[in-house]
Amino acid sequence: MKIISSLGSRLTNSLPIEKKQRALVEFVINTYQPQQRADLFRALTEHRKNQLLNLFPEHHNKSFSILFELMDYRELIRRYPNTFGEEIAHLEQAVSECYSHWLDFWCECEIAAIKTLFPIEADAPHRIELPLKDCAYRGFLIDQIEDSELWVTTPSHPQKMPIKDAITLSNLELFIKGEKWYEMLPLLSLSQKGKHFVLLKHPNNEASPTLVASMLVQDWSVNQTWLSYAQQFSNEQWQFCLPDHSYDVLMELQLFKPALSKCDSLPEFDHQFRRQLTGTQAVCEVLRLTVSGNAQQKLYFLYLAQKKLIQILNQMGYKIGFTIIEQPFILNFYQTIEPKSYFRSGYNDLNNNGKQSYRGFWMIERMDKVFSDTNFRDYRHAVSQRRKYDLTKRKEKEYA
């Protein structure tokens, strides 16, 4: 009852919504230990998710951002009261008055928890210069991010922190909060362990390097946890679009026994790929390409991060890199390159917002050649020209 009383005293009706939100976040961070907090968020998320799926079974393959917005959060709580005890019921009731849904609140708590651990000091730089010059940055793979002793800052939080926390903060701010990829919340631990590519700005006047881009790289040995093979990303609602000539290109790699045969759906292709792959050490999944900065800087870091990672993967002997991409700048560029370098395998409008997400894969040796022959000016020009071409085609359809 003391906790409930403490919560109530922080949320008087006269407070502005921003102060109520801040008070709620501070309450959760100060009341629950990290593992308690993680267990609470996961358990209540799973509970509400299952409730919503029972109410709207036709949305079982849709994203969390769609599912959790199908019904007004306050109405959901009113009709289906919380069964996790009085304390959690009061907490969720308070959250429903301040946030659009539980996942929105979870994300804000995780962001605040990291920033609270590493408060900005008085001598921290107010602004970090991010020049568009390749020589100002270095990119490399870290095998076990949880064991790394590297400390960095981020453009949004110029206070040094362990690289695993900086990657997590970037994923939270740019992917989960920015793009509403709430599916990443229960899997946030993947941002804090395993193999990651990082792109860092060399320290200039700053005390520490600055993280400007990162990617999660998962080997075949953990393919059972790949996002590409999760139910949401491998089902019949995905339009299969793998071109016929891709089978010959894949066969040339000599990674399959027997060779892959033509498929009619994405789940069928996934099943055959997993069953017949023998060269498992040459295949990986690349996810969570997170970039910082303004619009121009983000485009530049998209280019440079891909270029440097693909070069490293090629040097290490990787042949195929699975991807899930929604970012138009990346997709526009891929449509301009040598057609055997990248293959789309399927697409789906996961968020019902008119934006297609594409599953596909890099042919890494060919992609390395593409990026070796491409500077940022070429990349930007190719993206711009493709965008103009698509716009012209769209207008032609409208007037046809």
Swiss-Prot record:
Domain of life of the native organism: Bacteria
Enzyme class: transferase
GO molecular function, one term: N-acyl homoserine lactone synthase activity
EC number in record: 2.3.1.184
Alphabetical keyword list: Autoinducer synthesis, Quorum sensing, S-adenosyl-L-methionine, Transferase
InterPro entries assigned: AHL_synthase
Reactions catalysed: a fatty acyl-[ACP] + S-adenosyl-L-methionine = an N-acyl-L-homoserine lactone + S-methyl-5'-thioadenosine + holo-[ACP] + H(+)
Similarity field: Belongs to the LuxM / VanM family.
Descriptive protein name: Acyl-homoserine-lactone synthase VanM
Organism of provenance: Vibrio anguillarum
